[in-house]
Design a protein with these regions (language model features):
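Conserved active-site segments centered on acidic
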Residues: 1-81, 148-156
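Hydrophobic structural packing positions in well-ordered secondary structure
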Residues: 8, 59, 86-87, 139
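Helix N-cap/beta->alpha junction signal
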Residues: 15, 89-90
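Phosphate-binding/catalytic loops
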Residues: 84, 90-156
Length: 156
């Protein structure tokens, strides 16, 4: 089974959105038994909380429910548990790289590297600035690219 962890700052906006979108795509493609998903934050402020209501609303508008997810903090042992650890932005990437064992660096990626057509490396944080629908669009595009990569690398 291939395992994927999406990571942002607080695990209440971008990473649960990415987990929900990717989980929905995986289920739609009939791969739920082959790919496991989770999300986490580099910070600890929101542990145990559900996704931001605006993120849930943006997902709901597209037929995806992320209300069951709960925030947790990323830990070094996640690099042992997940094949893909995906940072939403450069700051998240630096924080994750600082806890990543050297022999697991190949598991750490920028999420938008799977969507070069977006033309950005960072998924913007909509918590203060808004833009949940634009973030959702980026996440959908990157999720399709990620699934294509997983299919290619893992023969799914």
């Amino acid at each position: 089974m291939v395992s994927v962890l999406f990571v942002c700052l607080g695990n209440i906006c971008r990473s649960p959105t990415a987990e929900g979108v990717f989980r929905h795509l995986v289920e739609t493609e009939g791969l739920a038994g082959d790919i496991r998903t989770d999300s986490a934050g580099t910070g600890s402020w929101h542990i145990g909380q559900p996704p931001d209501g605006r993120a849930q609303g943006a997902a709901r508008k597209r037929g995806i429910d992320i209300g069951d997810l709960r925030a947790r903090q990323a830990k070094a042992y996640d690099f042992e548990r997940f094949d893909y650890v995906l940072a939403m932005d450069s700051s998240n990437y630096r924080d994750l790289a600082s806890m990543c064992p050297r022999d697991r660096r190949d598991r750490l990626h920028m999420f938008l590297d799977f969507a070069p057509e977006v033309g950005k490396r960072d998924v913007p944080d909509p918590y203060y600035e808004g833009g949940f629908d634009a973030v959702f669009d980026m996440v959908e595009t990157a999720s399709r690219g990620l699934l294509a990569d997983i299919r290619h690398r893992h023969g799914l």
